């Protein structure tokens, strides 16, 4: 699932917990993105990956018991057809090759708002009811595109930029690093977690504070 795995994995843990009331599920996500470093390649995507990616791990416990930090109120995913060439990996003899298309930021800027609105509608919510996004910071231009698509003032996604600066893009765990910093600041009443991944996909999950 790539970068979308943090949101999708946590949503899966929530469904497993709901299927077994009283159970506790430990969700763990680990990514070693440094395997994308290719000293044998001068491909621009490989150079970007070397500069952008980092290794990381994150975990969260999901249960139907206790208040916790927030309730998972819903989740969803949008997959766009004929977009496999936008983002992903190729397996080559010397190692993994990253697929990054320049179309990613403009695609997000064009498509994200409708995808978010559709996911929220299924959850019985609207964009106006969301206090903050908690986004996977795929790159500086991706963060800029999210702010533009969602009509947010420039600089709104400050924690996303901080995590990207401090840790790099760690793929799936990265959005949980952003959530951690949001918790330290004080979690708003309703937060929509989002992440993009190969497919091209957008995963979303709604958190609501008790």
Language-model regions: role of each:
Residues 19-25, 47-48, 56-57, 66-69, ...:
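Short coil/turn connectors at secondary-structure junctions
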Residues 6, 10-11, 31, 59-61:
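Alpha-helical metal-binding/catalytic segments enriched in His/Glu/Asp
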Residues 3, 32-33, 54-55, 199:
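Conserved A3 ("GATE") glycine/threonine-rich loop of ANL adenylate-forming enzymes
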Residues 24-31, 62, 193-197:
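Short beta-strand segments
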Residues 39-110, 114-117, 196, 208-210:
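Condensing-enzyme catalytic core mediating Claisen C-C bond formation in acyl metabolism
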Residues 1-18, 109, 113, 127, ...:
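Claisen-condensing/thiolase-fold acyl-transfer catalytic domains that form or cleave C-C bonds
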Residues 27-48, 74-93, 139-148, 169-177:
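Active-site-adjacent elements of ketosynthase-type condensing enzymes
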């Amino acid at each position: 699932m790539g970068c979308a795995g943090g949101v999708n994995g946590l949503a899966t843990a929530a469904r497993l917990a709901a299927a077994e009331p009283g159970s506790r599920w430990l969700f763990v996500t680990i990514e070693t993105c440094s395997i994308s470093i290719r000293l044998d390649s001068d491909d621009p995507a490989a150079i970007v990956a070397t500069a952008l990616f980092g290794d990381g791990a994150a975990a969260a416990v999901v249960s139907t018991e206790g208040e916790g930090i927030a309730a998972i109120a819903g989740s969803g995913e949008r997959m766009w057809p004929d977009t496999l060439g936008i983002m992903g990996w190729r397996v080559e003899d010397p190692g993994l090759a990253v697929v990054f298309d320049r179309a990613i930021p403009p695609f997000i800027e064009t498509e994200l708002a409708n995808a978010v609105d559709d996911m929220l509608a299924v959850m019985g919510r609207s964009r106006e009811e969301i206090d903050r996004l908690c986004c996977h910071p795929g790159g500086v231009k991706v963060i800029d595109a999210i702010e533009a698509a969602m009509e947010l003032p420039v600089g709104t996604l400050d924690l996303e930029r901080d995590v990207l600066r401090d840790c790099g893009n760690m793929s799936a765990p990265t959005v949980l690093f952003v959530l951690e910093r949001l918790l330290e600041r004080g979690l708003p009443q309703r937060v929509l977690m989002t992440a993009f991944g190969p497919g091209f996909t957008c995963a979303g999950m709604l958190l609501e504070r008790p």
